[in-house]
């Protein structure tokens, strides 16, 4: 097992690259590729982040897009497309292990970095569709039932973050895979004009995972996490995530290896590490680090329970 892990860890990398970055105008459907002018491409996804993000910096010489009705007149992408925000960006990249990532993101911010008489360098901050839609939607309806059902409704219902029109499919958007772990407890609430992401993160703190044998689920729970990856949207309990088998064994021992393989029983060796051990009791108490409880009250029948 250790030999196979070591062999997999040291697979020879191959060439990586950006295959496609196409921007589509919101105004007239005009499309332009910036793949040849791209200087920097950064893609971010994290288990602690609600949405995926990317940053693209490209150089524009000013002869990129046709200007107006004159086919012989060209101008910069910023002016000719034009870039005003929320443009659709279809991206395809490939890493050193030949893993291809295809995604559709949207322009969240346009930052002109430098500009002179010869060229313009522009940075685009991109975000997923759900990140943009979250700022447009407010939840005012009442929700009854299990917390996992509430999460599913917020992510799939057309009134909230779900796909709305077939026109989005023409832009390259595809409905994302929704990976939701069932919860044991129920919770009824009213949206109170909150954003979907706010409600999802709020509900995740009180969610209790459903036990496989169905024998409970109202005990101590560390809560749930909500995050997005290139593969979809995920809502998983911390207990389930930490209960999995290790995906990677890492060793840090401050000593050089006699050969190129990691030590027996480990997959890789860490070059350096740092520890964050800032202790703030007041802040931890505010967040409920040492004691949490869920109070359930039904005003119609005066039912009261502390979980």
Labelled PLM ranges:
Residues 44-80, 259-307:
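An acidic/polar, Gly/Ser/Thr-rich interaction patch typically located in mid-to-C-terminal regions
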Residues 121, 128-130, 174-287, 292, ...:
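Short beta-strand-centered interaction patches in the first periplasmic/extracellular domains
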Residues 135-145, 185-191:
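Second-shell loop/turn segments in exported
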Residues 148-152, 197-200:
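Extracytoplasmic/secreted envelope proteins and their assembly/folding machinery
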Residues 151-190:
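N-terminal export/assembly leaders
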């Amino acid at each position: 097992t250790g030999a196979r892990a070591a062999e997999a860890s040291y697979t020879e990398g191959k060439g990586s690259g950006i295959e496609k970055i196409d921007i589509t105008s919101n105004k007239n459907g005009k499309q332009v590729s910036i793949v040849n002018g791209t200087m920097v491409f950064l893609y971010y996804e994290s288990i602690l982040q609600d949405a995926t993000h990317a940053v693209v910096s490209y150089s524009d010489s000013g002869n990129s897009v046709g200007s107006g009705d004159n086919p012989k007149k060209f101008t910069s992408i910023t002016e000719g497309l034009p870039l005003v925000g929320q443009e659709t960006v279809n991206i395809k990249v490939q890493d050193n292990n030949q893993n291809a990532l295809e995604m559709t993101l949207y322009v969240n911010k346009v930052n002109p970095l430098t500009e002179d008489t010869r060229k313009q360098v522009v940075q685009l901050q991109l975000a997923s569709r759900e990140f943009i839609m979250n700022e447009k939607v407010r939840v005012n309806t009442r929700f009854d039932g299990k917390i996992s059902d509430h999460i599913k409704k917020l992510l799939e219902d057309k009134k909230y973050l779900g796909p709305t029109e077939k026109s989005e499919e023409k832009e390259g958007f595809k409905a994302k895979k929704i990976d939701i772990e069932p919860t044991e407890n129920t919770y009824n609430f009213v949206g109170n004009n909150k954003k979907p992401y706010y409600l999802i993160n709020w509900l995740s703190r009180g969610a209790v995972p459903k036990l496989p044998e169905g024998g409970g689920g109202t005990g101590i729970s560390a809560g749930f996490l909500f995050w997005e990856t290139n593969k979809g949207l995920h809502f998983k309990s911390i207990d389930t995530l930490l209960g999995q088998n290790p995906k990677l064994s890492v060793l840090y021992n401050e000593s050089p290896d006699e050969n190129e393989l990691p030590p027996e029983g480990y997959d890789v060796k860490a070059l350096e590490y740092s520890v964050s051990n800032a202790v703030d009791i007041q802040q931890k108490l505010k967040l409920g680090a040492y004691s949490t409880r869920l109070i359930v009250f039904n005003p119609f029948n005066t039912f009261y329970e502390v979980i």
